Amino acid sequence: MVALRLIPCLDVARGRVVKGINFVGLRDAGDPVELACRYSHAGADELVFLDIAASHEGRATLVDLVRRTAESVTIPFTVGGGISSVEGITELLRAGADKVSLNSSAVGRPELVREGAQRFGRQCIVVAIDARRRNSGTDGWDVYVKGGRENTGLDVVRWAQQVTELGAGEILLTSMDGDGTQAGYDLQLTRAVAAAVSVPVIASGGAGCLDHIAAALETGPEGGHASAALLASLLHDGVLTVEQIKADLLARGLKIRP
């Protein structure tokens, strides 16, 4: 069994790390490279940078941030936001990113997933899916884009299967209902997607305590079956540390790097 991963997420807007609740009410959470170094030294397995303003406002992801991070940390990191071409993927990987995350651009042009995977290998291509539970009384979740502002009408599970077939090497799955609430991951969502695809699924949105993180990674009937847990508010606000979380997961018998 591959070791489970803890991945701090740094949502970036205008060069600063920000955090909100349900994708709104953003507040400043610090300098991205500074936080990246802190989490790297603390034992995080990977990092994710998401430029949450780029897709919405049409700006390119800051390559400078990638370069500075690559010079400062030794763990793998993913960058996403505003990547709309193979040239954009190339620029970020050359600047030092290990993976790129595609979200709105994958929905707008699914071929980009295949092109990126063919050029760089599927291990470099992450597809980020922002999911919101349907309020129509129908079971399931819809895919949202443009920073959670636009409902595509796509079914999350079917979309995850489609991008995996196109070449995505990993799914970054965010519950918009849970994002920033610290009320727990949407385990039903994570479990449904993990069961439907053959690539790792990263659980994101809602971690509030140690039990929530463990539940997302557990593989029993009530577990989330995720391969990794994305963490933001819990770490940025100092509620828990990477060391505390890893010690707890190891004590529960989960396979994770110490």
UniProtKB/Swiss-Prot annotation:
One Gene Ontology term, aspect cellular component: cytoplasm
Top class in the EC scheme: lyase
Catalyzed reactions per annotation: 5-[(5-phospho-1-deoxy-D-ribulos-1-ylimino)methylamino]-1-(5-phospho-beta-D-ribosyl)imidazole-4-carboxamide + L-glutamine = D-erythro-1-(imidazol-4-yl)glycerol 3-phosphate + 5-amino-1-(5-phospho-beta-D-ribosyl)imidazole-4-carboxamide + L-glutamate + H(+)
Pfam families per UniProt: His_biosynth
Disulphide bridges: none
Cellular localisation: Cytoplasm
Protein name: Imidazole glycerol phosphate synthase subunit HisF
Source organism of the structure: Synechococcus sp. (strain CC9902)
Lineage: Bacteria, Bacillati, Cyanobacteriota, Cyanophyceae, Synechococcales
